[in-house]
């Protein structure tokens, strides 16, 4: 997701995306613990996306 797309989301959309991405991250970590996933960089990318969404949510909340 690009930065411009993140900035265009509403506060409610940001909250929903954060919850969805956290669930996705949990599933990825669990799948990687059982057997290595094909692209382990997905975990890092998802974690960074959550951070970007959280940062934008904080900026919009102020």
Swiss-Prot record:
One Pfam family cited in the UniProt record for this chain: Ribosomal_L29
GO CC, one annotated term: ribosome
Presence of the UniProt keyword ATP-binding in the record: no
Record-level GO BP terms: translation
Signal peptide: none
GO molecular function per UniProt: structural constituent of ribosome
Superkingdom of the source species: Bacteria
Swiss-Prot/TrEMBL keywords: Ribonucleoprotein, Ribosomal protein
NCBIfam families tied to this protein: L29
Family, as annotated: Belongs to the universal ribosomal protein uL29 family.
This protein's name: Large ribosomal subunit protein uL29
UniProt organism field: Cytophaga hutchinsonii (strain ATCC 33406 / DSM 1761 / CIP 103989 / NBRC 15051 / NCIMB 9469 / D465)
Name of the gene this protein is made from: rpmC
